[in-house]
Amino acid sequence: MTMTDATTTDLPRWSVADVHASLDARSFTDALEQARADADRLVALFDELDIRATDTRPVTADDGAAADRALRELNRVTDAVNLLRVYVYATVATDSRHQRAQAVFSETRQLDATLRPLSSRLADWVAALGVDDLADVSGEVHDHCGPLRRLAARAGHQMTEAEEHLAAELSLTGSSAWGRLHADVTSQLSTEVELPDGARVLPMPAVRGLATDPDPAVRRAAYDAELRAWPTVEVPVAATMNAIKGEAIALNRRRGWTSPVDASLFANSVSRPTFEAMQSAVTSSLPDLRRWMRTKASLHGHPGERGLRWWDLVAPLPATATSVSWDEGVDVVRQAFGGYGPTLGGLVDRALDEAWIDAEPRLGKTGGAFCARFVDDRSLVLLNWSGSADSTQTTAHELGHAYHNTTLAGRT
């Protein structure tokens, strides 16, 4: 019996019906229409207040009032658009074949493209006037000094206002569209796996999950199935990856970044010395990792120069190779979180009771795992449960993000 047989029964699926009953519900269509109108009004407000690149000059009380209005509205509209996007993505991420959801998701991306140039304009404006000086005359700036300083620093790596607006608009048919194509193609890919108890057609997330199956024959069968499956979509997948990275390289160059790495480090608030220290630690640890891999190969019956087989790369050790049921995995996470504190421990049951989690691998569902902020202090957690210790760790990891989101609830 494989983990796919033993553990997919009654795995949880998330529900967002308490926010809107469906994509066709009047409440949702009204909210989407309101968001469109609010986004257009926000652009008009930024034009009215002249929130854009300007010459350095002394800050006035009028600037403080402008900052208060702009930031309040930007936060309000952004929160509303984010809620709509995540609501729709809850369907797209679990069923990429849902045509209505795909169409509406494209509309939410259009809203993102409308709002994105406004953050660039705000960055130029606060960089010119100075965050600290604006904070003296604006309560909103005072309350958001940290993110606004980051935004002001970003102004040194922006194109002109017109170019940033064009980049946002073109992304809809560029990197954003290519990214959706990649997700659609890979989520809808399935393949036949020659399992010990007979051939089965499985979606790719489920096939990937078999890489941690206790049975080496299952792991090898899954590996062989992957090698047969991926070449069938290699042309569109390669095209999407090249297009997305090509756009990023071009934009980073036009924005004055010396390398794509520097742009990524800034976006993730990681300094170059910190990055280099981490890289140095990884490099110095590689001999230990190689020794461990050779030891693991021997434990799996593959001693000698050929070393660890690909299908055993993430396999459990033979002595610990057991399947983990969903309930067992949840218990492990609950106990570990409870050891930290009752609030974190209680989050596990709350996430289950309130249907935050979608755990079942299935055709049309995005691979991997993620946690997305949703509404109030609530998150959505996507998993592709495979019944392994790795799946248990992934569940803990994503619920850890959910806990982080609860602590950030209400912040802008």
Regions found by a protein language model. Give the residues of each.
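A well-structured
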Residues: 1-318
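Active-site recognition of the HExxH zinc-binding catalytic motif
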Residues: 22, 256, 386-408
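A sensor for short, sequence-defined functional sites
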Residues: 119-122, 126, 340-344, 410
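Inter-helical turn/loop segments and adjacent helix faces that build the functional surface
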Residues: 272, 299, 406-412
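Long, K/E/R/D-enriched contiguous segments that form extended
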Residues: 295, 299-345, 404
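Short pre-active-site segment immediately N-terminal to the catalytic Zn-binding motif
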Residues: 321-326, 332, 374-396, 410
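Catalytic zinc-binding patch centered on the HExxH motif and its immediate surroundings
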Residues: 322-324, 357-377
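Long, positively charged low-complexity segments
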Residues: 348-349, 382
